[in-house]
Amino acid sequence: MKKNFHLVIGNPIAIAHGEVGDDAWGHTQFPAAFHTVNGKILVSWEWCDDTIEYKGNVHSAVSCDGGNSWGEPAAEDRISYPKMSNGKCFAGFFKKGAHPVSYFDQYIPAYTSEACGKRYFAKEIREKQDTTVYGIEADPVTGETELFECKINWPYMPIGVTASGMVYPSTMVFCLSQRCGLLMSGEKMYFSLYFHGFNSDAASRKEALLPYMDKYCVYIFESCDCGRTGNYLSQIPTNEEVIQSNPNAEGFCEPMMARLPDGSISILLRTGSNDPSFIARSTDDCRTWTKPKVFDSNGVLPQILTLKNGITLASYGRPILKVRATSDPSGMEWDAPIILPLTESTDPKENEKPWGKKQQSCFYTGLLPLSDHTALLTYSDFHYPNSDGIQVKSIMARKITVVFDE
């Protein structure tokens, strides 16, 4: 049953500021929010060039007052990760950036394109250093971490080599799921990821090429042992509707899932930098999905979160920042989006910056529940003034509160 409600959006709160004049793409961007083991909030963000090599420079800040003020994290301010069957915590998948290789030259690719390079079936590659997926387990007391090898059951699992000869390791493909597609549900963990992959539902190798091989495809996995084993469940390949709207679209990618009040699972999907976002629904725990339909006219890394009061929130953007909500238990009917204004640049040379056009944010957001009725939204604002009044790239937060109408 739908409920009448409205959202109260709090004022912007600055978490951290970048350096004056640092306009490099990837610096002071891509915030994510977490709870810590000691009851605080931790927000992390990237400070490195946004490349497939992934140099991995992550900064963070913590709040002990619900997001009102922020400071440097201490050693004990560790992220609260899900427990594994061995008593350790699952801290995600190991990040290993793309790197040059030559050993793939001895293999015949299953697919080659100028746009996306070469695709191979991972099981046919004898060398395992780039096809192996590694998880990270953390000691719940000390926080010390170590790697473990994941057993991945994925029909026609892909591995790709770019046109410049860089292999994109399988463990990095799975690493993407912890930022945009990890869902805990009881004793099970579902993770969704995306890649220029194959048709994992194909009856044979010869039938494993998808209609749009140069577009991303979303794949969903289930783990009953908190990440040690990943079993393929389903896929959401790019469809004709996406191609018709924009032949240059990236395809379905950056998936984010949430369990809805009626027990179903909704998934939000990006299709491009300034292209529509889509939504699909599963009523059988990710084994099948409804045909994706347009969610909004934009949406990179769309976030979705169901609060304990039954209201589901979404945040997304590019070229504008939006928040949306629904009381529909199935998550299929949403209220109109709310546009959140960002700081306008006062720099007359804004259009000459590295990204080539005026842009106010990376528009990658994070959503974290604070209570039954409140969530924390994190985002970047490229022109927010620092303590000296100088506009710099900044990591920001705003509280979203659900108020039920009488």
Enumerate the predicted regions with their spans.
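Asp-box/BNR beta-propeller blade signature and adjacent active/binding-site loops
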Residues: M1-E406
